[in-house]
């Protein structure tokens, strides 16, 4: 809120990192209202890893220059069955985070469980459920693609303060498995 008592809009860039495709989604928040700005994908070509990471870094910087976000929300890495895939995903995350940090933007990180809980209300929701809820929450005419939807969901999670659709647990309580427990 500004000093004049007005609510100030905040622009959030959500990123869903991947070495082949990194989804991005930009939303504006004004109080509890969410407004879609843009979404898309940064794609890398097959080739040497350093070149692909540079493509991601440059792509994130270009998105930031175009849409001028105030904050960035990035999905955290999950541990895959294949350790090599996990390492590559971690490097892609590093490139997109460096892109944001090099533009002097604050970066928040959320697990997939937190993002799904925030957007769908269920931490183990299917990708299609996330796409559907992103479409509804942002009043989109069509469902965004899976990578863009995940990025928009990450931005929505950040707009919700990392909390689920039900909001934060009250003072003196904590949220666990969808319910508030007394301390």
Curated annotation (Swiss-Prot):
Cofactor: bound how, per the entry note? Binds 2 Mg(2+) ion per subunit.
In the record, biological process GO terms are: DNA recombination; DNA repair
Q: Which residues form the active site?
A: 16, 75, 147
Write the Enzyme Commission number(s) for this entry.
3.1.21.10
Binding residue positions for Mg(2+) 1: 16, 147
Q: Which residues form the signal peptide?
A: none
Q: Does the keyword Cell membrane apply?
A: no
Which chain positions lie within coiled-coil regions?
Answer: none
Provide the protein's localization.
Answer: Cytoplasm
Record keywords: Cytoplasm, DNA damage, DNA recombination, DNA repair, DNA-binding, Endonuclease, Hydrolase, Magnesium, Metal-binding, Nuclease
* Residues holding Mg(2+) 2: 75
Keyword Nuclease belongs to the record: yes
Cofactor(s) needed: Mg(2+)
Subunit architecture: Homodimer which binds Holliday junction (HJ) DNA. The HJ becomes 2-fold symmetrical on binding to RuvC with unstacked arms; it has a different conformation from HJ DNA in complex with RuvA. In the full resolvosome a probable DNA-RuvA(4)-RuvB(12)-RuvC(2) complex forms which resolves the HJ.
| Family under the similarity heading | Belongs to the RuvC family.
| Annotated protein name in UniProt | Crossover junction endodeoxyribonuclease RuvC
Q: Which gene encodes it?
A: ruvC
């Amino acid at each position: 809120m500004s000093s004049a008592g007005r609510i100030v809009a905040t622009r959030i860039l959500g990123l869903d990192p991947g070495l082949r495709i990194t989804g991005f989604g930009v939303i504006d928040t004004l109080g509890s209202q969410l407004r879609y700005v843009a979404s898309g994908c940064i794609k890398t070509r097959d080739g040497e890893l350093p070149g692909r990471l540079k493509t991601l870094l440059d792509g994130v910087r270009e998105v930031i220059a175009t849409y001028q976000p105030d904050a960035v929300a990035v999905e955290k890495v999950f541990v895959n069955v294949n350790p090599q895939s996990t390492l590559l995903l971690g490097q892609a995350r590093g490139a997109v985070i460096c892109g944001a940090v090099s533009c002097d933007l604050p970066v928040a990180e959320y697990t997939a469980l937190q993002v799904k809980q925030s957007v769908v209300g269920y931490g183990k929701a299917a990708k299609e459920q996330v796409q559907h809820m992103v479409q509804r929450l942002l009043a989109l005419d069509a469902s965004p693609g899976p990578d863009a939807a995940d990025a928009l969901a990450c931005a929505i999670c950040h707009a919700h303060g990392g909390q689920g659709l039900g909001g934060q647990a009250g003072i003196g309580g904590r949220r666990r498995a969808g319910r508030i427990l007394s301390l």
